[in-house]
């Protein structure tokens, strides 16, 4: 018995927007409705998220993954398209739109808004990355247990989604800056 269903049973209108991380991805888990963005995460070849459907209408022929950074990559890059096409913008806009058009007199609203970022890919619009130009981003913390994982990985040679390795402090700081800006 999931919380959205409990609230729905108590008279709420329940809605989820953004990353839900479900499978199958169109199961509502008690929500009256959802608008999904799984940021490229596809477990069902027949599933296309609401964000990607919207993106195809807004930017025909363009690629929402234009940075080339994928789900679970720890590399970083600047979002290459208009920031109004970014998944973070879409999620916020969908939530604001629902709230502004919702009649609170009808029944109480439970709205779950789940932004896919700062999860990878680390692809913020440039203006947000600029906020961290002079930020003091600390070197990665390395514990005593790291010895068994200490194999030196060169970022150009390593898979961008490798679970561990020494990618070098500058690589990690750059990824963190993009994470913060996301």
Language-model segments: which ranges?
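Formylglycine-dependent sulfatase
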Residues: 1-182
């Amino acid at each position: 018995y999931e919380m959205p269903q409990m609230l729905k049973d108590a008279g709420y209108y329940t809605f989820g927007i953004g990353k839900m991380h479900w499978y199958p991805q169109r199961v509502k888990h008690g929500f009256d409705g959802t608008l999904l963005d799984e940021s490229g995460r596809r477990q069902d070849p027949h599933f296309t998220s609401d964000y990607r459907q919207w993106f195809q209408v807004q930017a025909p022929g363009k690629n929402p993954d234009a940075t080339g950074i994928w789900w679970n990559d720890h590399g970083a890059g600047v979002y290459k398209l208009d920031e109004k096409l970014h998944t973070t913008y879409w999620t916020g806009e969908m939530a604001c739109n629902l709230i502004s058009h919702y009649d609170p007199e009808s029944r109480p609203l439970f709205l779950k808004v789940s932004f896919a970022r700062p999860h990878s890919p680390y692809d913020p619009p440039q203006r947000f990355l600029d906020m961290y130009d002079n930020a003091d981003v600390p070197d990665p913390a390395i514990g005593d247990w790291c010895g068994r994982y200490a194999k030196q990985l060169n970022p150009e040679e390593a898979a961008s989604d490798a679970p561990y390795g020494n990618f070098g402090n500058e690589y990690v700081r750059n990824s963190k800056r993009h994470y913060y800006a996301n």
